[in-house]
Swiss-Prot record:
Residue positions, PTM Phosphothreonine: T677
Compositional bias annotation for Polar residues: 75-91, 138-150, 162-173, 242-251, 610-633, 652-661, 674-685
Gene transcribed to yield this protein: MAPKKK5
InterPro entries from the UniProt entry: Kinase-like_dom_sf, MAP_kinase_kinase_kinase, Prot_kinase_dom, Protein_kinase_ATP_BS
SMART domains associated with the record: S_TKc
Record's compositionally biased regions (Low complexity): 1-27, 263-273
Catalysed transformations (reactions): L-seryl-[protein] + ATP = O-phospho-L-seryl-[protein] + ADP + H(+); L-threonyl-[protein] + ATP = O-phospho-L-threonyl-[protein] + ADP + H(+)
Protein's UniProt name: Mitogen-activated protein kinase kinase kinase 5
Length: 716
């Protein structure tokens, strides 16, 4: 085309023939036909090249000025070719050779060329399903741009197909490298997935797996990579939202795994779990991409809006959903169930007492709501005291499992959980006799002491008949229920006598201990029946504790109290009845052989007085203890005993007024029940009114009784 300036600046008198003559004179061969064939061959061989040799020969006949002007234009055109500019929008279609003599200006490079190329790389099904001519045109246009001046695009599709097998791998054309692959459902990713994509047999696409090389201008935003949670396996699939672009037009559900999820810059966008990060690639924490994240995000958003395809099948290992994962129980859950005692039947409640070797709690049954006393003891295998404690607990369990009596606490069971030992016993409320004394002004009436003593002896008689000695009878080990029934508890010091000798060691509490235990006489005695006498001595000390509120010799310390027990007998309270004093003298016999047994003491008049027909029965005592109304309204004969003085004594009344007033009082006031009488007579105990005879056999009140009730002799 360098002969175009010569046409523009030639004189009008010159002709085409004269202008072409220098070409023949400067040719290498004198044959014009041969030169034309050679030129035709060069044009055909260097169609896509510049053809400098031929064009330079045609410019040899020009003047110096024309040659300089043509060389400037040639240098400008050559620099344009070597700059490696990307294609213009007009390069998508072939432009025919223009016959015009006026050269067209070259297009300028566009700023959004990189974004358009990324859009082409990020396309899914649209780029895969394009026609071959469009694909070849795009691939060819990624090289040096061809303008309409030099031509080269006016060729048929057959020649273009032949040339398409040759690829230019130079650094200038590496960005335009394309791979024609079959349609697959996996997204384009800059990383190779070690897990192959599952093939969909339902659509009939039985296609091989593929690998896409990374693009040199691929842009993504590197997010925070997750850290493995301790105790959980590493995930099989990473969340593809780790890259800010989702190049797959087909979106699968996000995988769920019991670990920390990957934080993505685009959390609201769906992801595909088919591609995972290469295991050899080290994880990156909080690495920001040097490229702007909006570069590929905007293209992807516009690309995904127009897709309507079938969803991908879930990959292996990612089929569990969040609901199913949440419903799977933790492997540590069954271990927690085994930590509850008695197969999760009893739940520990509040603390109700502490002993020498453990604590006692209130436990409730989770199925029935029943209550029991749970004794808890910590186990220390290397501690000698703990070994002794375990020995006593085993002895207590062995004894209680063979005892069944209304005046002995019932044994439910026992077990060992980890380093703790549990014993489940009958729960007796409100508690021990010691607690009962503190809650009732520190003392008891003799009638209450008599009733409690009878219950204690009943349990001791049964226990001694089983050849078992308790050895720790005191107020703290005697429990009282709401009905006033006393039960023996705490058999840690108990011993079952099997041999012919009563070999008892020094065990028990000093204030309630028998003197023979301190003198070690029982170890030399051959009569085992004398061993039961230690419980009778302890019973006498407990009676004093109930009557006075403290055990004998309580003013002394432990060692001094032991010396007092060895030398003297406990003092008997002076306020007790003669029957009560005689009962205590029998219990405090220094010689154990002279002490009566529990069965013999049950026949003592101190206890028989409460069993006579003139006194309420045992059931009546228990009902009075509960504050129940147990009597019927009294007869007319006994009403004056319970009348209140409503008329002044010094008031002078006629006989008619007195009779009318007496009738009015009889109609207005009824005899109150025993509960009201008991509450008025004794604020300390509800059993203080028991010694009086029953209403049917009650004698006529004396003058002193009439004064106490406020009834005058005139009213009678």
């Amino acid at each position: 085309m360098r002969w175009l300036p010569q046409i523009s600046f030639s004189s009008p008198s010159s002709s085409p023939s004269s202008s072409l003559k220098p070409v023949a004179s400067y040719s290498e061969s004198p044959d014009p036909d041969r030169n034309q064939d050679r030129d035709r061959f060069h044009r055909r061989l260097f169609r896509f090249n510049r053809g400098r040799l031929t064009r330079q020969r045609k410019l040899r006949h020009l003047t110096d000025d024309d040659v300089l002007l043509g060389e400037r234009r040639a240098s400008t055109s050559s620099s344009t070719f070597d700059s490696g500019l990307t294609r213009s929008p007009s390069a998508f279609t072939a432009v025919p050779r223009s016959p015009s003599a006026v050269p067209l200006p070259l297009p300028l490079p566009l700023p959004e060329v990189a974004g358009i190329r990324n859009a082409a790389n990020a396309r899914g099904l649209d780029d895969r399903d394009r026609d071959p001519e469009r694909l070849i045109s795009d691939r060819t246009s990624s090289g040096p741009p061809l303008t309409s001046v030099n031509g080269g695009f006016a060729r048929d599709s057959r020649k273009a197909t032949e040339n398409s097998s040759y690829q230019d791998f130079s650094p200038r054309n590496r960005n335009g490298y394309w791979v024609n692959i079959p349609t697959m459902s996996a997204p384009t990713s800059p990383y190779m997935s070690p897990v192959p994509s599952p093939q969909r047999k339902s659509t009939g696409h039985d296609l091989p797996f593929f690998y896409l090389p990374p693009k040199s201008n691929q842009a993504w935003s590197a997010p925070d990579m997750p850290l493995d949670t301790s105790g959980l396996p590493p995930p099989a699939f990473y969340d593809i939202t780790a890259f800010s672009t989702d190049n797959s037009p087909i979106h699968s559900p996000q995988p769920r795994s019991p670990r920390k999820q990957i934080r993505s810059p685009q959390p609201s966008r769906p992801s595909s779990p088919l591609h995972s990060v290469d295991s050899s690639a080290p994880p990156r924490d909080s690495v920001s991409s040097p490229l702007h994240p909006r570069l590929s995000t905007d293209v992807t958003n516009g690309r995904r809006d127009c897709c309507n395809v079938h969803p991908l099948p879930l990959p292996p290992g990612a089929t569990c959903s969040s609901s199913s994962a949440a419903s799977v129980p933790s492997p540590q859950a069954p271990l927690k169930l085994d930590s509850f005692p008695m197969n999760s039947q009893w739940k520990k409640g509040k603390l109700i007492g502490r002993g020498t070797f453990g604590s006692v709690y209130v436990a409730s049954n989770s199925e029935t709501g029943a209550l029991c006393a749970m004794k808890e003891v910590e186990l220390f295998p290397d501690d000698p005291k703990s070994a002794e404690c375990i020995k006593q607990l085993e002895q207590e369990i062995k004894l209680l499992s063979n005892l069944q009596h209304p005046n002995i606490v019932q044994y439910f069971g026992s077990e060992t959980v980890e380093d703790r030992f549990f014993i489940y016993l009958e729960y007796v409320h409100p508690g021990s006799i010691n607690k009962y004394i503190r809650d009732h002004c520190g003392t008891m009436t003799e009638s209450v002491v008599r009733n409690f003593t009878r219950h204690i002896l009943s349990g001791l008689a049964y226990l001694h008949n089983k050849k078992t000695v308790h050895r720790d009878i005191k107020g703290a080990n005697l429990l009282v229920d709401a009905s006033g029934v006393v039960k023996l508890a705490d058999f840690g010091m108990a011993k079952h006598l099997t041999g012919q000798r009563a070999d008892l060691s020094l065990k028990g509490s000093p204030y309630w201990m028998a003197p023979e235990l301190m003198q070690a006489v029982m170890q030399k005695d051959s009569n085992p029946d004398l061993a039961f006498a230690v419980d009778i001595w302890s019973l006498g000390c407990t009676i004093i504790e109930m009557f006075t509120g403290k055990p004998p010799w309580s003013e002394f310390e432990g060692a001094a109290a032991m010396f007092k027990v060895m030398r003297d007998s406990p003092p008997i309270p002076e306020s007790m009845s003669p029957e009560g004093k005689d009962f205590l003298r029998l219990c405090f016999q220094r010689n154990p052989a002279e002490r009566p047994t529990a069965s013999m003491l049950l026949e003592h008049r101190f206890l028989k007085n409460s069993l006579q027909p003139t006194s309420p029965s045992n059931s009546d005592v228990s009902q009075l203890f509960n504050g129940m109304n147990i009597t019927e309204p009294s007869s007319r004969r006994e009403k004056p005993n319970f009348k209140l003085d409503q008329v002044p004594r010094a008031r002078n009344m006629t006989s008619s007024e007195s009779e009318s007033g007496q009738q009015q009082q009889q109609q207005q006031y009824r005899s109150p029940d025993l509960t009201g009488t008991v509450n008025r007579l004794s604020p300390r105990s509800t059993l203080e009114a028991i010694p009086s005879p029953c209403p049917s056999q009650r004698p006529k009140p004396s003058s002193s009784d009439r004064r106490r009730t406020g009834v005058t002799s005139d009213h009678l």
